[in-house]
């Protein structure tokens, strides 16, 4: 029996010259009939902690730790999925003929979505609006995904409108921060962020620095090697 899922995409440090070593593209996925209940549960978490801001990795600090800890616990106890693609930008070779950074970016979005979309189901895909190029970006993504008949909707959404986009931002931030810690790019003095990273590692039973099996659905990571 066919099911409908909503996929909420986000991206982090994806610009070519933003000073960050990794590009991350990700999504949070949830079955359409479960959206209302999930929204209500997340709203209750925010109210319990008197938290009124968007969920963002940049908003994680000691005073907000408990609400983020509850959010992560809730995710792993409920029927949602997270997937991320991670690329070391230093490995991207723009010297290849007819190949640009933007070409690579869209190919990675294709990999993010195509590998986990089941032809037996239908999907509504929402992408976080990032910049003034959003319209052109959407048109190109639609062109790339046009042969995938399972995708019913592909449109933009603003992050403040979707707690599921915000959830993807938190997980990406944790993955990125963990990688930069290992690389020595950050000192790791933010105890709240370190504690959340350890919580995610414990729940997912992975290190956050290597690929998981494609069949692993709850928390799926794909580190793309271009060497």
Q: What kind of region is each of these model predictions?
A:
Residues 1-227:
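Phosphate-ester processing/binding pockets and catalytic centers
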């Amino acid at each position: 029996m066919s099911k409908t899922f909503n996929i909420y995409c986000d991206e982090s440090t994806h610009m070519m010259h933003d000073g960050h070593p990794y590009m991350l593209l990700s999504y949070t996925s949830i079955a359409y009939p479960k959206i209302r209940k999930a929204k209500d549960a997340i709203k209750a978490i925010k109210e319990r902690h008197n938290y009124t801001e968007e969920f963002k990795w940049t908003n994680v600090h000691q005073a907000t730790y408990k609400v983020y800890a509850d959010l992560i616990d809730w995710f792993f106890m409920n029927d949602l999925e997270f997937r991320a693609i991670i690329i070391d930008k230093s490995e991207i070779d723009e010297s290849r003929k007819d190949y640009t950074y933007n070409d690579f970016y869209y190919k990675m979005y294709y990999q993010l979505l195509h590998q986990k979309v089941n032809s037996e189901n239908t999907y509504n895909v929402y992408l976080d609006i990032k910049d003034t190029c959003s319209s052109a970006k959407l048109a190109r993504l639609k062109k790339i995904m046009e042969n995938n008949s399972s995708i019913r909707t592909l449109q933009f959404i603003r992050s403040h409108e979707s707690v599921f986009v915000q959830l993807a931002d938190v997980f990406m931030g944790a993955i990125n921060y963990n990688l930069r810690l290992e690389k020595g790019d950050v000192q790791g003095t933010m105890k709240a962020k370190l504690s959340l990273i350890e919580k995610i590692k414990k729940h997912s039973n992975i290190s956050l620095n290597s690929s998981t099996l494609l069949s692993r659905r709850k928390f799926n990571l794909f580190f793309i090697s271009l060497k």
